[in-house]
Structure formats: structure tokens, C-alpha cells
């Protein structure tokens, strides 16, 4: 095959597209695992303090403080965020979603 500008452009485009897809799928899977781990941890956070009865307010205040601090860090900056901050944000979203699901289960 003759090496033209068009063929080198397409080769470069395919190579970069492969790299982008690989890294984006890697971030997607780790983000999904982090989200599901947060959902799993929320079940423990909602049941363990309920057994003793006196840790409910303290646990709720710690969860709210961590949620607000994470939201402040993630949503205040407009630059590209670190992957660890995104994973922690997904973990926070999983915990919040899990607590809402537990509240709906108790309400029904």
C-alpha cells in the first residue's frame, strides 16, 4: 500500500480512537464498580447504627459532611478532575442512592 497523507491520517485516527476507547472503558468500569461498592456500603451504613440505636445521628451527620465536602471538591472546579476524585464521587453517589432505596423500602 502506498503511504499517502490520507492513509497516515486514517492510521493516526484509528490509533488515537483505540487509545481513547480503551481509557474511557477502563474509567467506566472502575466508576461503575465504585458506584456499586457505595451502594453495597450504604446497606451496612443503614443497618449497623440501627442495631445500637444511639449512633444514628452521628452516622448521619458524618455521611452528610462527607457528601457535602465531596460535592464541594468535585463541582467547584471546572478543570479535568483526577480519576481518584471521580471514583470517590461515584462512591458517594452510590451511598446516597443506596440510602434512598433503603428509605423507600422502609416506607412501603
Swiss-Prot record:
Pfam family, one: DUF565
Key words of the record: Chloroplast, Plastid
Compartments it resides in: Plastid, Chloroplast
Claim: Cytoplasm is one of the keywords in the record: no
PANTHER family (alphabetical): PTHR33787, YCF20-LIKE PROTEIN (PTHR33787:SF5)
Similarity annotation: Belongs to the ycf20 family.
UniProt protein name: Uncharacterized protein ycf20
Species this protein is from: Pyropia yezoensis
Record bears the keyword Cytoplasm: no
InterPro entries named in the record: Uncharacterised_Ycf20
Cellular component aspect of the GO annotation: chloroplast
Principal location listed in the UniProt entry: plastid
